Each structure stands twice: as structure tokens, then as C-alpha cells.
Amino acid sequence: RMCNEKIYRDMKLKIHFSHKEELWNSWSHAGGILMGFVVGAIFLYWCFTMHNGWATAGVILYLFGMLMSYIASTVYHAVSAWSKWKERLRKWDHAAIYWHIAGSYSPITLIAMRDQGYWGWSLFIFIWACAIAGTIMSFARLKDHSNLETICFVGMGLSVLVAFKPLIDSVSTATVWWIIAEGVCYITGAVFYSINKKKYMHSVFHFFVLAGSICHIIAVWDILMKYI
């Protein structure tokens, strides 16, 4: 009996969200999955129609990162807090955020910035290297470095500032503003993520992520219209 009580206490400590919160967390990013498939079909149809290999590669990586992130998040939050899969899915959820960020950079670096000297390829390689390293880190003990992960997410997102001049030389002014708006959404979301022990703050974070994704979708569409 004492052993069972200890297990119960240990599992209870792992529960951060109520059932209603988890419903909001799950369904909000389920909307991201639907959005990703609809937008993906449109983007890929356009790339295939224009017979542009680089655009197709950039869009596929982008869709992979975005969809894996939303799928991992949706499944993780949908699974019962008492499930043995919960902790494993949490690791995938965190790892997929790195893929989402790296995927978001792919259309920019492989389409718009590919001819900007070494900038496009350097940024592409750096971001995906960070994603691989972040994935490895995510499968370590997350509670030991959760704040470090948040810093890494924001750092990866802001790394485009290093190549900001080549970026604005490659895309339209409207695209730049959409990317800036995206960054504002993600950084604001990160603030709510950092206080997610307060009720529904994690759900608010999810909606800011969705808003950032919408901004990036518009930016990628602008890039596709300009280059293919």
C-alpha cells in the first residue's frame, strides 16, 4: 500500500494541466494539423506545377517540421496523464519544436537566400545542426534543462538577425514584416510558456504558436510568388 501511495504521489507531481486544459492544448494544435495539410496541399501543388525543385525541397522540409510539431503536441496533450507513454511523448513534443523552427527556415534559405553568397546555405546548415542537437537534448532528462530549451528555441528563431541584410535583399518588404510579426508571436508565446503552471497559460502559448504559423505561411507564400 505504501508503495502504491508513493507511485501515486510521484505521478501526481508530473500532472501540470487539468483535463480541461489538456483538451484546449490538444484541440488547439489539432487545428494546426488541419491548417498544415490544407496549406501544404496548396504549396506543393504550386511547386509541382512550376517544376521548381528547390522550392519543392524547401516546402517539404517546412511542412515536415510544422506538421510533426503539431502532431506531436496534439498527441502528447491528448494522452492521459497516467499513461506510460506520456513522458515519452513529451520528449517527442519538445524535439519536434526544433524541427518546426528548422523547417520554417528552409523555404527562406533554400529559395529566397540561396543565391545570397554563403548566407543561405550557412544558415540552413546551422539551423538543422541545431535541430539535430536539440533533438538529442530533448531525449535527455527534460526537467534538468527545460529553461535551456526555451533559450535554444528563442535563439534559433532569432538567428536570422545575423543574416538580416541578405534577408531583406532577398524578399519583399511585406515578407519581412510577416516574419517580424511571426517572431513577435513566438516570443510572446514563449513568455506564456515560461509561466505555464498558471492555469490555461500553456493554451495561450499554443494560440500564439498558431498565430506565428499563420504569419509564416503568408511569408512563405509571398516568397513562392516572387521566386517561382
Question: For the regions a protein language model found, what residue spans apply to each?
Answer:
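Multi-pass alpha-helical transmembrane bundles in non-GPCR membrane proteins
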Residues: C3-I228
